[in-house]
Amino acid sequence: MTYRVDEYRAASDRYDAGMVYRRCGRSGLDLPAISLGLWHNFGDDVPLERQQAILRRAFDRGVTHFDLANNYGPPYGSAERNFGTLFARDLRPYRDELIISSKAGYDMWPGPYGQGGGSRKYLVASLDQSLQRMGLDYVDIFYSHRFDETTPLEETMGALDSIVRAGKALYVGISSYSGPRTREAVAILREMGTPLLIHQPSYSMLNRWVEEDLLDTLEDEGVGCIAFSPLAQGMLTSKYLDGVPAGSRAAQDKSLDPALLTDGALAHVRALNGMAQERGQTLAQMALAWVLRDDRVTSALVGASSVEQLDDNLDALTTLDFSDDELAAIDQHAVDAGINLWAPSSSH
């Protein structure tokens, strides 16, 4: 794949372009209110030049956090490899302005040690591979991507602690852990002397499981929160207002089961879209602002298939406030849509 070879110089006004930065829990680290996730759109099925344009635009608008995982693609590993190529080409001079994260927890390579989980062997080896793919000496944040009930939590957290002490990550986090397991993880890491920086759960208007006890837990423990899938795998965009378009995630059965797009579910989405229009926002912009209404949420992770889509999402930051009446009206339609694919991890 090819990419632009012209010299990239970051916009001089990138920190005056409307980005909001929030403190991550009780740490000393700030994150942008909207971060760029590379779960989709950065594999080998997307032209490298398009990926490059998205990364350049994101940084030019003050997005300093890029979130990856070992298995992002397709194929597995390709998002990290492509990011590494573009980082070396465009972003290496700005390394100290960036927060780059990766994760490990799902199947990645053949044999018993690459099938995922939370073993020390898998996590350390996986991060070493990620660093090699991205051409980095360290990541800023490394996550346990899921809770593994077959591995002692002490081993998983011990691996994260040793990764920090080895200089391979500055901070550590967890993803899709329940409230009680999060408290356990915090306690184990605290005893080791390595604080848990951040939790990455799925959270959106149509997937509100974190409100049961996780957000309270994170606040109590001083842990930040970065919400992934805040647009409900695309349901909270204009994409599905009139059905399932060709090429969409639902049409391709990628992370969004088309069976979930029932008449009832779409009626709620259309009602929310009407409220967004009254606010002068797109549905996606209102959905992002809604996730960020709670100051316990440090950042919302968005994906982008184009510069235009990225810009639309970032423009959510111009209108973050809601009236009590607006929130009450939204609650009538912000109902569970059965889209939490990660519930098996957070159910323990």
Question: At which residue positions do the language-model features occur?
Answer:
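N-terminal binding-site loop/beta-alpha segment at the start of enzyme catalytic domains
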Residues: 1-98
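Beta/alpha (TIM)-barrel catalytic core signal, keyed to glycine-rich beta->alpha loops juxtaposed to Asp/Glu
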Residues: 3-18, 147-332, 337, 347-348
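Short acidic capping loops at alpha-helix termini that bridge into adjacent secondary structure
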Residues: 32-33, 67, 93-98, 137-141, ...
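Active-site groove signature of glycoside hydrolases
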Residues: 131-151
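Short, acidic/polar
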Residues: 45-58, 118-134, 182-186
